């Protein structure tokens, strides 16, 4: 699973996401993309599940790019622990995804296969998504 090798601060305050994506909102590498229609934190496990679903659907054909990275720590205290005694340990890593963010890209496969693979990956994610085609291919 994806996680940062080294971070400046091990734990972070939760914070909130708002607004639309100002960067990472255009297809840069591939021919097709999966774009978020909602703002949400996506876990490293969800990203990996979507990646596996996509690559299995295209059966070694084409190339897949993951455009989001889980670099925000999510802490959690152990079960049945009293309050206090400091902040809990890092439970997992999240990727902040805003509305309009291109999460995955794909190239080297027919459009129908790419769309089917992306929709399969979309079912593994907690956000509504849409399939997009690069502008110069339309």
Curated annotation (Swiss-Prot):
GO terms for molecular function: rRNA binding; structural constituent of ribosome; tRNA binding. Residues 1-20 are annotated as: Disordered. GO terms for cellular component: cytosolic large ribosomal subunit. Residues 1-15 have a biased composition (Basic residues). Pfam families: Ribosomal_L16. GO terms for biological process: translation. PANTHER family: 50S/60S RIBOSOMAL PROTEIN L16, LARGE RIBOSOMAL SUBUNIT PROTEIN UL16M. NCBIfam families: rplP_bact. Belongs to the universal ribosomal protein uL16 family. This is Large ribosomal subunit protein uL16. It comes from Borrelia turicatae (strain 91E135). The lineage of its organism: Bacteria, Pseudomonadati, Spirochaetota, Spirochaetia, Spirochaetales.
């Amino acid at each position: 699973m994806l996680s940062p090798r080294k971070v400046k601060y091990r734990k972070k305050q939760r914070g909130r996401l708002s607004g639309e994506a100002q960067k990472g909102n255009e297809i840069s590498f591939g021919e097709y993309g999966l774009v978020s229609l909602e703002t949400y934190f996506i876990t490293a496990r969800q990203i990996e599940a979507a990646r596996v679903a996509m690559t299995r659907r295209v059966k070694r054909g084409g190339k897949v790019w993951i455009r989001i990275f889980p670099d925000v720590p999510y802490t959690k205290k152990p079960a049945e622990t009293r309050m206090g005694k400091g902040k809990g340990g890092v439970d997992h890593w999240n990727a902040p995804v805003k509305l309009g963010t291109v999460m995955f890209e794909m190239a080297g496969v027919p459009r129908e296969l790419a769309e089917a693979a992306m929709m399969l990956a979309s079912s593994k994610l907690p956000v509504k998504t849409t399939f997009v085609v690069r502008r110069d291919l339309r």
